[in-house]
Amino acid sequence: MTRSYIPLNSLRAFEAAARHLSFTRAAIELNVTHSAISQHVKSLEQQLNCQLFVRGSRGLMLTTEGESLLPVLNDSFDRMAGMLDRFATKQTQEKLKIGVVGTFAIGCLFPLLSDFKRSYPHIDLHISTHNNRVDPAAEGLDYTIRYGGGAWHDTDAQYLCSALMSPLCSPTLASQIQTPADILKFPLLRSYRRDEWALWMQAAGEAPPSPTHNVMVFDSSVTMLEAAQGGMGVAIAPVRMFTHLLSSERIVQPFLTQIDLGSYWITRLQSRPETPAMREFSRWLTGVLHK
């Protein structure tokens, strides 16, 4: 369908009716009659050659086609409304401050940012990185991307992606590792969690490392993988965040066994109101990750 044939009034009527699941409430919101909403929806259904609503025992319901169309319109109208508001207040740039755990920033977010800037040029994005210990209120952050179980005090958290952990090491060390037990011939590199290696060894069917085993602790998986590339030992880290190193063969994943100790989440303090820019960023990021 070309732009000249896009039925904007019918789409507005459908979006309001679908959001409220009521033609009456949609008519009140748009300041038109119930009959006008009904006619616009009927016209849109004829143009799309499909039914968008059905009437059930509990009232108006969306069809599968209606459910597919609604989020697209929600996003489009939100973006248009947000831009018009910014022009009206002479603020064409909306600032957005994000704190991102370094591993996710390098392994996932940074490669995607050019797409975000193309799609949302009106958002002035400020990014700071952290090592999963962060104070969003003190730092004035709109969103914080964290690793963990999804529960933080007075915080809303939305799931982004998994962070399955597995051993990673240099090709030189990998050539000397035939079984999981062979990993214990080398220093073990880990983050602040003491039980990572014990849990992975258990999943691989091996005994945990000795309490006296040579272990190096890092506050960032990024610096830990730098050490692993240099042959300083075998790291345990979220594989998904280091696909760029795996594809270039700078590091190797010697075994497919993985453990689930946490995931990545986008979080917001409940005391912080959600702005249009925040909603746009969250919707964009979850969209690209969940494709």
UniProtKB/Swiss-Prot annotation:
It is found in: Cytoplasm. GO terms for biological process: DNA-templated transcription. Residues 6-63 form the HTH lysR-type domain. Residues 23-42 bind DNA. Gene3D superfamilies: Periplasmic binding protein-like II, Winged helix-like DNA-binding domain superfamily/Winged helix DNA-binding domain. Disulfide bonds: none annotated. The keyword Hydrolase does not apply. Keywords: Activator, Cytoplasm, DNA-binding, Transcription, Transcription regulation. GO terms for molecular function: DNA-binding transcription factor activity; sequence-specific DNA binding. Transmembrane segments: none annotated. It holds the Pfam family LysR_substrate. One of its GO terms (cellular component) is cytoplasm. Regulates the expression of the beta-lactamase gene. Represses cephalosporinase (AmpC) in the presence of beta-lactams and induces it in the absence of them. Belongs to the LysR transcriptional regulatory family. This is HTH-type transcriptional activator AmpR. It comes from Citrobacter freundii. The gene is ampR.
